[in-house]
A protein has these predicted regions:
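Aromatic- and charge-enriched surface segment that lines or borders ligand/interaction sites
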Residues: 75-111, 134, 203-209, 264-266
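Append "and occasionally in soluble cytosolic enzymes with long acidic Gly/Pro-rich linkers
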Residues: 178-181, 265-362, 366, 426, ...
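Long beta-strand-rich cores associated with HINT superfamily self-processing modules
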Residues: 473-501
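Ligand/substrate-recognition segments at binding pockets and active sites
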Residues: 27, 173, 293, 326-399, ...
Length: 501
């Protein structure tokens, strides 16, 4: 393991030190914590990783609805029983042995990958020769090819280096990352530059001054300067050649309850009360209508989503009744005569996070519950969540593929931390229903099981379902061929560098 880590770091140390002549694409990005595919835990990690590596499969840049595409490998041949997948190598600089080695790292006990859940259904994996990988599953898995398109399925060479479109040439932690294109491509960006800029006002000013080509999300504070009352882009920005791109995402955002916590874990009525106290109209207003209030874990547009109203949606009178039934009438703990105090841990103390956290506290205040806010750095926050050292925590899940399973896996007991089930929710009935869905032979049968899974999660409330994101991005006229996507990992390779006259 120690040698493997040394090789991984050494591979980046050998990246080309010289810059290439040509255009540079600059955007801000939240802190990247790792460039190791097996250890990646955030979309920010994924965006950097997919510039340097190629996943087993990719997602077609242009196709809508979203569709898989070849990447390191061609699309697989699948056996009639749906258990065996054969992948032919497509990247001449990689071998089948590289693929097997990279995927095996996900389930290595030495690495303890947070993405090991991806490989739990794999019975065997082997390189039949240099050009062919065979993966056999324990049972049918209709979404397995989508797992092979995730950044965690990125393929490393033996020395830890990648064969993606770019190579990392500079990484100033918490400040800047610079990537140079391995092979120059006429009309495309030769350099990609990620900047860590915490202050949203600074991000906005840098974009207006042309110091950034792309703004990945228009902040709440700047929304009125971007979009007029008619819902259209401000004419002054249009005159500068700026374009607004708005699409629904597959992001589900939530406040999680640590189910191992002695206060919130065993008290379902308390969790239901806090859900009912969450003021969705006020939350949507806070975000200037740039979000979709959530009614469960699955975003709109995903097949198998439960469409009935959430029984613990905002209802202050119901919340007051439930908090009393939970043993805290008016938020008071009868055993102490004092108010119930809960702690919400949030990663990164940005202005938006502070203000939105205070808003949540005001919601709980209306049923007598005091909410204290604790802020940590992103790395420390993830560690605290994975180790169960939080009570309530605010986080989200960015869908890896458009399937209900991708969101409902967040509640399966086999995926407890450090897997994606960060709340450590355990419900044997849910697990059984989930497993039946995976074994279903038809989409109709599978969706019935997904509906039952969602009904259980809605009743147990291991989350406060806060919202689903919309993507509202801006490009300057320096960027061409930009197609907004929920799978925007490594897509900078397709952008065209435009000269502004």
């Amino acid at each position: 393991m120690r040698m493997a880590r040394h090789l991984f770091l050494f591979a980046f140390a050998l990246g080309a030190a010289k810059g290439m002549d040509g255009a540079t694409f600059t955007r801000y990005l939240e802190r990247v914590t790792t460039m190791d595919p097996a250890l990646s835990q955030s979309i920010y990690d994924s965006r950097a990783i997919m510039l340097v590596y190629r996943s087993v499969l990719g997602v077609d840049y242009e196709a809508r609805p979203y569709a898989l595409a070849p990447d390191a490998c061609e699309l697989p041949e699948v056996s009639p029983d749906g258990l065996t997948y054969r992948f032919k190598m497509r990247d001449p600089d990689l071998t089948a042995h590289d693929v097997v080695r990279s995927l095996e790292r996900l389930r290595s006990p030495d690495i303890v990958s947070p993405n090991g859940w991806m490989m739990k259904g794999v019975a065997s994996m082997m390189a039949l020769d240099d050009c062919t990988v065979e993966i056999r599953l324990n049972s049918r898995c209709h979404y397995f090819p989508w797992l092979m398109a995730m950044s965690s399925a990125a393929v490393m060479k033996g020395d830890g280096s990648g064969t993606g479109p770019y190579e990392l040439v500079k990484w100033w932690k918490n400040h800047e990352m610079v990537f140079n294109r391995r092979v120059p491509s006429p009309g495309k960006f030769d350099t990609v530059r990620f900047l860590v800029v915490d202050d949203v006002s600074t991000q906005w000013l840098m974009f207006l001054k042309g110091e950034m080509d792309f703004l990945g999300d228009v902040s709440r504070d700047n929304w009125d300067a971007v979009v007029g009352v008619d819902g259209k882009l401000d004419p002054a920005l249009v005159a500068q050649g700026v374009e607004l791109h708005s699409i629904p995402t597959m992001d589900t955002m939530y406040i999680g309850f640590n189910m191992r916590d002695s206060v919130v874990g065993p008290n379902r009525k308390l969790r239901q009360a806090l859900n009912a106290a969450f003021d969705y109209p006020a939350w949507e207003h806070f975000y200037a209508g740039r979000i979709i209030p959530a009614d469960g874990p699955i975003p709109p547009g995903i097949e198998g989503r439960l469409e009935t109203p959430f029984q613990y949606g905002f209802d202050l009178e119901k919340a007051k009744r439930l908090i009393a039934e939970a043993g805290y009438p008016n938020g008071i703990d009868p055993s102490t005569g004092r108010r119930l105090v809960l702690t919400l841990t949030i990663g990164r103390a940005s202005q938006d996070n502070r203000e939105s956290g205070e808003l949540v506290a005001s919601f709980f205040e209306k049923i007598g519950v005091k909410l204290e806010l604790a802020f940590q750095t992103w790395d420390a926050f993830l560690k605290s969540v994975n180790e169960g050292r939080v009570q309530l925590f605010r986080i989200g899940w960015v869908g890896d593929y458009p399937d209900a399973q991708n969101f409902l896996q967040l509640f399966h007991s086999k995926n407890k931390s450090p897997g994606p089930n960060h709340t450590d929710y355990v419900n044997p009935e849910f697990d059984a229903e989930y497993d039946l869905a995976l074994a279903a032979n038809t989409a109709e049968e599978r969706n019935l099981h997904w509906i039952r899974c969602q009904e259980m999660v809605r009743e147990d409330c291991p989350w406060i379902f806060t919202h689903f994101n919309k993507s509202n991005s801006l490009t300057r006229p320096t960027v061409g061929n930009y197609i907004p996507s929920v799978f925007s990992y490594g897509y900078e390779q397709f952008y065209e560098a435009k000269e502004v006259k």
